[in-house]
Regions:
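Bacterial N-terminal signal peptides
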Residues: 1-12
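Flexible coil/turn and secondary-structure edge motifs
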Residues: 14-211
């Protein structure tokens, strides 16, 4: 029994140390169902969780957020290994999975809870998010309409929203097609839509160079 207790304690400590080496980022890009998949496909991402952020209601429900008045947006929280990927790479994927010109919603989903927002948690994330917005505006040739603000709290969404594209692949594909998401992304981003065909100069942001 004593040996078993020692093993449990050591194992738990090891997991905690590994988790402490991870970082997180929170993004709003319209329907959170559609924002999990592109980040899940990125090497170095450990997990994605759909949820709510930006509002004043504690532990909101989907019904409350959808009805309005909570101030929350649908978001995805991305936990990643900074040794395997970077916040800059997450930003690259984020921008190319949203319509950066629509501040009032995304695609067929309009309203406050669907507006695009980059929620930062550190000064470095704030600086990189601002730099990325300038970079995207330069690439696309006009200003972007995406809010960049500090994260006050993140609340996980209900279980049935998590991994929706995996659990309900047919409904997910139908919703995505009906909403015109891919069509609009192709119009805005061309062959870089959804984060494909990465721009090799994007990570110049890591050195502070935006050229």
């Amino acid at each position: 029994l004593a040996l078993a207790l020692v093993i449990v304690v050591c194992t738990t400590a090891g997991v905690g140390a590994q988790e402490s080496d991870l970082s997180s980022a929170v993004f709003a890009g319209g329907c959170f169902w559609c924002m999990e998949k592109p980040f899940d496909e990125l090497d170095g991402v450990v997990s994605t969780t759909s949820g709510y952020a930006g509002g004043h209601v504690v532990n909101p429900t989907y019904e409350q957020v959808s009805a309005g008045g909570t101030g929350h947006s649908e978001v995805v929280r991305v936990v990643y290994d900074p040794e395997a990927t970077s916040y800059e790479e997450l930003l690259y994927v984020y921008w190319r999975n949203i319509d950066p010109f629509d501040l009032d919603g995304q695609f067929c989903d309009q309203g406050h809870s669907y507006r695009p927002v980059i929620f930062y948690t550190t000064d470095e994330q704030h600086e990189l998010a601002l730099a990325s917005a300038d970079r995207v505006a330069g690439i696309l040739g006009k200003p972007v309409n995406v809010e960049i603000r500090e994260l006050n709290a993140f609340y996980p969404a209900e279980d049935y929203h998590q991994d929706y594209y995996i659990r309900n692949p047919i409904r997910y594909r139908y919703y995505r097609a009906r909403c015109g998401r891919d069509r609009r992304l192709d119009t805005v981003w061309g062959d870089q839509a959804q984060g494909e065909n990465p721009d090799p100069t994007w990570l110049d942001m890591q050195t502070g160079s935006m050229n």
